[in-house]
Amino acid sequence: MSEHILVIDAGTTSTRAILFGRDGAVAGTAQAEITQHFPQPGRVEHDPQEIWQATLNCARRVLGNRPPESVAAIGITNQRETVVAWDRETLKPLARAIVWQDRRTADVCRALRDKGHEEAVHKETGLLIDPYFSATKMRWMLDNVDAVAQAQEDGRLAFGTVESWLVAKLSGGAHVSDASNASRTLLLPLGEAGFSADLCDLFCVPIEALPKVVDTHGEIARTDRAL
């Protein structure tokens, strides 16, 4: 019988794995720090591969000698606006993740506000046009990282927030994002079940590179048995 729920907390400075029993009691925890990269003033990056390895290592540590079958489900909580780009076929990251704290797209956001787009975007998404959110981070990667641009040209680009990246790695390729994360991209209208083509056009983000939006609960993918 599956006796545990495994929760992954992929935070800004560390990754944690917490194992809960059927009674809700904590059966074990493991934690690993995540390296912060500051390549220039105002820029903050993470290594997606480090996030993945920390997640995998913490999960294995917290499980100990328990069989994988003892875990009924895995839940993920994470730093929501951080953007990861990867090759959807190889599942390899194409660049460092741009973290929610990063301000490199401030000028792009200012230009969009100056053109009068903020009121409509706010009405549609509930968010303001700000570098904090994901859309302009995605556009920056396309404009400035050759591997990302090439992957888009080849039809292999996958964008996502951290939970989307981890689900892809855990499942062997599922490309999904739960609504609470997708809502922080500036690309998901309030009350809608999928990303907006018009918002993607405004922010110059290819909608085909985005994940499928799914509910925040229920089964969204199955783990790769090879893990």
Where does each model-flagged region fall?
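N-terminal glycine/serine-rich phosphate-binding loop of ATP-dependent small-molecule kinases
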Residues: 1-95, 123, 211-212
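Glycine-rich phosphate-binding/catalytic subdomain of phosphoryl-transfer
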Residues: 60-227
